[in-house]
Regions:
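Positively charged, helix-rich recognition surfaces that bind polyanionic ligands
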Residues: 1-182
């Protein structure tokens, strides 16, 4: 190997090491910020392998790979598990992004469909609604508590609309959220 190659390889190794440290610091910062908001953490199971899988049909080869490495979801969840007093991992059949509490049924949506209407006509943002459904878990049965959904939805819907309005007024661009900024 040439000396130039050895120098470049050492420089690359050093940059990768610095990137890893920065990712870890960012994860710790995020977990600590969430910890300051409460002591219960409800999440879906880690499924990085599923995100990396190639689609079964079609020609698209695009899958999540580098973006998973850059965000470290597994490390984030392990740090949350370590720091939160109550850590709940919902079962795979919970399907928070597919459930509609107004009709009590699961409706499959495409990944690109970020804003959608519930059966009663209410427009919700997918990620915010999924986090609301995770909030409405019955800790004893690990199922969605429909009564809690009905009682808490108005408050959540108001918070969602305030958040979207704040994002639009301050021209904050949130990638892949479906929120239009003029």
């Amino acid at each position: 190997m040439s000396n130039r190659y050895k120098k470049l390889r050492t420089k690359h190794t050093e940059l990768c090491r610095i990137n890893a440290i920065n990712r870890h610091l960012a994860v710790h910062e995020d977990v600590n910020e969430l910890r300051s908001l409460g002591d219960v953490f409800v999440t879906e199971p880690k499924n990085a392998k599923k995100l990396q899988k190639k689609a079964k049909t079609g020609k698209r080869k695009k899958r999540f790979g580098r973006s998973i490495k850059n965000r470290c979801p597994g490390y984030f969840q392990s740090q949350a598990k370590r720091k939160f007093r109550i850590y709940v991992e919902v079962p795979n059949d919970y399907k928070a992004s597919q459930y509609d509490h107004t009709s009590d049924e699961y409706i499959k949506k495409s990944l690109s469909q970020r804003m959608y209407k519930l059966q009663d006509g209410t427009m919700v943002q997918r990620d915010l609604y999924s986090s609301f459904l995770l909030y409405c878990i019955d800790l004893n049965t690990n199922k969605i508590d429909k009564n809690k959904c009905i009682h808490e939805f108005e408050k959540q819907y108001k918070n969602q609309n305030e958040t979207i309005e704040y994002i639009q007024m301050n021209q904050i661009k949130v990638m892949n959220s479906g929120i239009k900024v003029n």
